[in-house]
């Protein structure tokens, strides 16, 4: 996303962002990682501006205090409808296999509470399968979607009435990894980036970070 100010100044694609102010919540955030990878691919320099909260970033982008930001489509699309913010590219073009979310636990649980951890993953994976079948593949039709929205609304957007929460729940639908599988190449890439930015110790290895014995590993 870019501000209207940047858009009117000629920013039409990510390659036009050289020297621009790119909003992040904080150093090391997914926003920082995505912006950094995009900048490296386009061979440009960005000035990263930490603003802590998403609401603050949206306000700064609308007012032109920052030039660009990246956010999930179900938030980006409504923001782009008002004219003060424009969509100019897709993160997936730069990180096509980006593992943005994982299931994680303490090393004690992974090492010493194996049955508990495996049972959680089994239950979690069943929930993911039900969610994908209903919300993405629509195997139960509109009635199934509505039933799932009712269930999700008990925990998400609870401050909104159901009719106002439903569009956000539906628009935020995404396919999660089957069986909580891990794209190890993506995780390695992220770990190396954290090291290059001085955000984690150089001594940390992929085996420190990932227990590969629990789920399917995608390399």
Model-derived features with residue positions:
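A bilobed periplasmic-binding-protein/Venus flytrap-type ligand-binding module shared by bacterial periplasmic
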Residues: 1-10, 99-115
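Sec/Tat-exported extracytoplasmic proteins
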Residues: 21, 26, 39-42, 65, ...
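Bilobed "Venus flytrap"/periplasmic-binding protein-like clamshell domains
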Residues: 1-81, 185
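Ligand-binding "clamshell"
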Residues: 78-92, 163
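Short, solvent-exposed loop/turn segments at the edges of secondary structure
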Residues: 17, 97-100
